[in-house]
Amino acid sequence: MSVDIRPTPPAQDSARQNVTLQIVSVVMFTFIGYLTIGIPLAVLPGYVHDDLGYGSVLAGLVISLQYLATLLARPYAGRVIDGLGPKRAVLYGMAGSAASGLFMLLSVAIQGWPALSLASLLVGRLVLGAAESLVGSAAIGWGIGRVGAPHTAKVISWNGIASYGAIALGAPLGVLLVQWLGLWSMGASIVLLGALGFALAWPKLPAPLVHGERLPFHHVLGRVTPHGMGLALGAIGFGTIATFITLYYASRGWANAVLCLSAFGGCFIGARLLFANSINRLGGFRVAIICLGVESLGLLLLWSAPNPWVGLAGAALTGFGFSLVFPAFGVEAVNLVPASNRGAALGAYSLFVDLSLGITGPLVGFVANLFGFRSMFLFACLASLSGLALAIALHRRSRRPG
C-alpha cells in the first residue's frame, strides 16, 4: 500500500510564505541602507546647485560619486561576503552609513564656507557608496544562504523591491524633512538609520559560509561582463531620472518633480510583485528583452512630454520596465560561477550598475549643457535600446549548441 506524501496546496503555500518571510527578514537591511541613499537624493542636487552655488555638472557629480565609490569597493565587498560572511558585511555597511550621515551634518554646519561644505559632502558620499557595496550584495548572499540557490531570482527580486522601495519612500521623505526641520535633519536621520540597522543585524544568525575554490575577482568579472553591460545600459534611465528630474521639471516650470521618483519606485515594486516568477518561467534573457523595451518607451515619453503628467507617466513606465532588468541578467550571470564565489559574482555584476550610475551624472549633465534638459531622456532611451540589442544577442548565443 502506497501513501501519497506530496505536499497539499496549503502546505505548499505555507512553505512559500516561509521562504518569503526568511528573505524579507534579511533584505530589510537593504531597505534601511537604501533609505539612507533615498533621503538626500532629491535634495542634494538643489543644495549643491542653489545653496552652494555650483553648476549642474558638479551637482550631478555629488550624486554619482556615491555610485563610483560603490563600484571601486565591490571587489573588497565580495571578499568580505565570501570570506567573513554576509552578516559581517551588513554590520560594516550599517556603520559606514551612519558615518556618512555625520559628514552630511558637518557639511550643513559649515555651509557658509561652500568649498569646505562641498568637500565634507563629497567625503560622506564616498563613505555611503562603500557602505552600499557591502549591504546590497551581502543581503542577497545572506538570503540565498538561508533559503537555497533555487530561490536566487526571488531573493534578488525582493532585494530590489527593498532598495527601490526605500528610494521611492526616501526621496519625498527627505524633501519633507528639509521643509519641516531643515537641512540638518538629512544627516541626523541617516545616522539614526545606520545605527538601527546595526542593532537589528547584530543578534541575527549568520548564513553558513560556502567552502570551495575562490576564483580571482578579475576571472569572475570576465564571466559576468556581458550581462553587466546590459544592466549598465538599462540603468542609465534610472540614473537620469534620479539625478536630474528635479532640475528638468524646474527648467520646464513644472512642480512636484519628486512624484516622478515615487512613481518610478512604485511601478518598479509593483512589477516585481506581479511578475516575480517570470524569470523562472521565461528565462532571464527573454525577461530582459521585454523590460528594456518597456523602459525605452517610458524614456521616450519623458523626452516628448508636453506637461508634467505625461512626464510622470513616463517615469512610471520607466520604473515598470527597469524593474526586472537586474534580476533577469543577474540570474544568468550568477549561474556562471561556483557557489563559493557567489558574493564575488554578485559584486562583479553589481559593479556595472555602479559604473553606469557613476558616469550618468556628469555625462548626462554634459549632454544637458549642450542640448538642454529634454535631450537627457533621448540619450537614456538610446542607451536602453542598446541594452535591448545586447540582451537579444546574449539570448541567441545561449541557445547555440555547445
UniProtKB/Swiss-Prot annotation:
Which family does the entry's similarity section mention? Answer: Belongs to the major facilitator superfamily. YhhS family.
Concerning HAMAP family, the annotation shows:
MFS_YhhS
Presence of keyword Transmembrane helix: yes
Is this entry keyworded Cell membrane?
yes
Locate the transmembrane regions by residue number.
23-43, 52-72, 90-110, 121-141, 158-178, 180-200, 228-248, 255-275, 282-302, 309-329, 351-371, 375-395
Listed InterPro entries: MFS, MFS_dom, MFS_trans_sf, MFS_Transporters, MFS_YhhS-like
GO molecular function terms noted in the UniProt entry: transmembrane transporter activity
Q: What is this protein called?
A: Uncharacterized MFS-type transporter PA14_38730
